[in-house]
Amino acid sequence: LADDDAGRAKALKKIKVFMKKDFIGIFKSLEGRPATIRLLDPPLHEFIGTMDAAQKKDLSKKIGMSAPAITKRIHALHEENPMLGHRGCRLGISYPAVTAMQVEAILEAAHEVQKKGTKVLPEIMVPLVAYARELELQKDVIDTTAGEVRKKLGLKKSELKYTVGTMIEIPRAAITAAEVAKHAEFFSFGTNDLTQTGLGLSRDDSSSFLPTYQDAEVLNNNPFAGLDQEGVGQLVEMGVKGGRTTKKKLKIGICGEHGGDPDSVKFFHRSGLNYVSCSPFRIPVARLALAQAALEEKGMARGEVS
């Protein structure tokens, strides 16, 4: 809601405190395992789009902005199609301080935990990238901020490490993955949004006609539950091939509900992905599917599986 740099800096300073505390908890819990952290991604309407009069009045007291001014600012931020609007890396490019604040919180938290003997491996993930230049710009902010944090803490580069990667959730990023990979140390296919953008299908609004489409055999299943392997799956394979053309050992995975769907998981294994990420309750299913995929692959190599 801030309408100038000073107001924005003040708000970011407050947010950083909460984020740093959360990251410390995450790093401690992981006990030395890698932590992939996606930079802020949700569209603004998820925070302020449905504020009623009482909420505006309460917010007015907290931030010292009048209710009419809050209403005016909300109207100025309104978007007709927020899921494809000012979010993800677009927000970070418009307001680099938003990205810088998150990086400060991540790395300062990493240092706090490392001081107590726990290894920390932050993987900073830039969301909603469509152009390689977007990732390049955000990586510049991340690296510059990291240098400032190290200087402030009196650390060498080797004493506070991190990697930078990107979500592949826009078809253009998958198609131009060879260029995007020049600035990435890992890819993570965000298959929820890649399905939306690849099929032109809203995850929130398609439930009214998906059953009809399945009855009419337009779709064999719900593409948000099981990956559309012939369409969206081709974008995944294209992205894997392009990324590894540039960097042969590029780490690639997926995140989203498809990571817990057995058929989708087997497809990802065949496509050469290194890992899948899914909701905690789906992990046993994902592990079983990966084991089955590996056994099927070995069987095919020996000619035992048709």
Predicted regions and their residues:
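Conserved alpha/beta-domain cores
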Residues: 1-306
